[in-house]
Amino acid sequence: MVKVNGNYLKLKAGYLFPEIGRRVKAFSSANPEAQLIRLGIGDVTEPLPQACRDAMKSAIDEMGTAEGFHGYGPEQGYAWLREAIARDDFQARGCEISAEEIFVSDGSKCDSSNILDILGSGNRIAVTDPVYPVYVDSNVMAGRTGESGDDGRYGGLTYLPISADNGFAAQIPSEPVDLIYLCYPNNPTGAVATKAQLKKWVDYARANKALILFDAAYEAFIQDPELPHSIYEIEGARDCAIEFRSFSKNAGFTGTRCALTVVPKGLKGKADDGSEVELWGLWNRRQSTKFNGVSYIIQRGAEAVYSDAGKQEVKALVSFYMENAAIIRRELSAAGIEVHGGQHAPYVWLKTPSGMDSWSFFDHLLQKANVVGTPGSGFGAAGEGYFRLSAFNSRSNVDEAMARIRNL
């Protein structure tokens, strides 16, 4: 009989969102008349920007002609998209990132997991707690952790608690680590990092020859012009950081799939024999071997994000969701609930009322208000007693959800 990857058996009972789905399905089966409002998983609800739709329609028409047909494209992404990304997302903010250092993909979740393919198994890993579950689970699947304890934490990982007590700012580890996962604006807490805070991480990484994996999937939601959008706005970050970004939330590409990873040339790791190896070459080889690239049609849609019309439409989308977040913050605060986040990110992180644990509050909202959110404990032990609500929904649904919660 074929053997399975035993590391998968170390995973906790269920990935957070499938467990939410299981409970919601059971509730809906028992209460088919219930009108659920989903403010849980961070999936967008508004239509794709017109500029992106027009570009994809045009690309489809091209594909219908012999002259305009495109088969396999470059695994790294088409040059015209990579150049637009480099110019508008990085160089415009003073980051020395070239088009060649950008790899277009079908999702930052995939990339933040797949990056482990080019990193050794003996690295000491640090994650915040609470944390986006994919960072932890992908390391478990790859055999980079020990077993999980009663508190849900895995052996072999360094956990960096973030809470209201420390302003949701992870403290620099007291011991050396090799791999650091940072996400700003943060999922799930909605917290942001200043340049000074990121500078401390870059200084630590350079001093300890560590690698920062920086998830900037929500950078478009930052409202304060003084806050950094990229780790590469920090001097020295090219020497110690890989950055992940996505078109999913700012441009509504959750269903069309397009993202990017930045691997600076000159960024190095260490081989078993002690020699230094450039990570760009390893990632390029990995993508060329295991990935066929994002479709031509989708990349044309992503390129349109950088057109004048696309920029305005994306800005309007972001503003719409941030207005939703402001409504959620205002209404929860008026109801006497302690709230965090939601000012530079599309997530509101609330303290569960009356000392309820996270999953009890989930069930309470589901059963009494027919509102679906995300239990904070699903993001880690330090998330117990917190709860995440997403601003990704229609205005009418957000208003109705808040009315239901107020009436509890």
Swiss-Prot record:
Q: According to its UniProt record, in which pathway does this protein act?
A: Amino-acid biosynthesis; L-lysine biosynthesis via DAP pathway; LL-2,6-diaminopimelate from (S)-tetrahydrodipicolinate (aminotransferase route): step 1/1
Q: Does the entry feature the keyword Transferase, yes or no?
A: yes
Q: Which reaction does it catalyse?
A: (2S,6S)-2,6-diaminopimelate + 2-oxoglutarate = (S)-2,3,4,5-tetrahydrodipicolinate + L-glutamate + H2O + H(+)
Q: Name the cofactor(s) required for activity, per the record.
A: pyridoxal 5'-phosphate
Q: Name one Pfam family in it.
A: Aminotran_1_2
Name the positions where pyridoxal 5'-phosphate binds.
Answer: 72, 108-109, 132, 187, 218, 246-248, 257, 292
Q: What keywords sit in the KW lines?
A: Aminotransferase, Pyridoxal phosphate, Transferase
Task: State any single GO MF term.
Answer: L,L-diaminopimelate aminotransferase activity
Chain positions with N6-(pyridoxal phosphate)lysine modification: 249
GO BP: lysine biosynthetic process via diaminopimelate, diaminopimelate-aminotransferase pathway
Enzyme Commission number(s) from the entry: 2.6.1.83
Q: Which residues bind substrate?
A: 15, 42, 109, 132, 187, 292, 388
| Keyword Transferase in record | yes
What does the protein in this record do? Involved in the synthesis of meso-diaminopimelate (m-DAP or DL-DAP), required for both lysine and peptidoglycan biosynthesis. Catalyzes the direct conversion of tetrahydrodipicolinate to LL-diaminopimelate.
Q: Which PANTHER family does the entry mention?
A: AMINOTRANSFERASE
Name-wise, this protein is LL-diaminopimelate aminotransferase
Organism of origin is Synechococcus sp. (strain CC9311)
What gene does the UniProt entry assign to this protein?
A: dapL
